């Protein structure tokens, strides 16, 4: 069950309208690593968690907060689009250079959403459920969460550098702070799960069933041997085994040769040599 509080978690009010920045801000709303993605990712991970109540609550708490961030950013986008001086835009558009800049505004904001946010990226790509990860393996999922928060915070930081609007910066500063917390919480939870299950996912798969002679080899597929300069090659692997550097990649299989396709699929016939 969800309950909507009719107040934002943090203010979302720009100093002035800016339809072009509204377009840019769509990325942290409906882009691959935007707030819609992390909210849905955490929700489905939480709903699918079995027998780990403290992690389920952690996921649901964070997911619910992210829904509030969706609301904040959508509100900010709408406010960046409202009160735009249309008469001034029309006059400015008579200049071909300025007109081309104004043409960079997201037309969806005017045509589709009526000066409101859309569930899409800054380039108009619709949000997709294919962006989310919810595997049922918490260690794998929490690593995906760490990546999502890292990419998301990076994009917010870049947006912060693109504006001088104090109201926008104020909200972005809050989002940066919350992403700092979320990165830290996933790092801490990952460390806890690694102590229980080991660092390799899934930790429940029998080692005897994998070809262990290849399990810790760093294979050089490049010219030169610069990849051998990794300091960690001289240390134990995170799972306690020893790393091995292979200077030159070797082949262990045969040349792949396929049978001709059956006539009914109408493939190109094999050439005669």
Curated annotation (Swiss-Prot):
Binds 1 Ca(2+) ion per subunit. The keyword Transmembrane does not apply. Its cofactor is Ca(2+); Mn(2+). CDD domains: Mn_catalase. Pfam families: Mn_catalase (PF05067). InterPro entries: Ferritin-like, Ferritin-like_SF, Mn_catalase, Mn_catalase_C, Mn_catalase_dom. Residues 254-273 are annotated as: Disordered. The keyword Ribosomal protein does not apply. Its EC number is 1.11.1.6. Mn(2+) 1 binds at residues 35, 66, 69. Mn(2+) 2 binds at residues 66, 149, 182. Keywords: Calcium, Manganese, Metal-binding, Oxidoreductase, Peroxidase, Stress response. One of its GO terms (molecular function) is metal ion binding. Ca(2+) binds at residues 57, 61, 220, 222, 224. It is an enzyme of class 1 (oxidoreductase). It catalyses: 2 H2O2 = O2 + 2 H2O. Catalyzes the decomposition of hydrogen peroxide into water and oxygen. Belongs to the manganese catalase family. This is Manganese catalase. It comes from Bacillus subtilis (strain 168). The lineage of its organism: Bacteria, Bacillati, Bacillota, Bacilli, Bacillales.
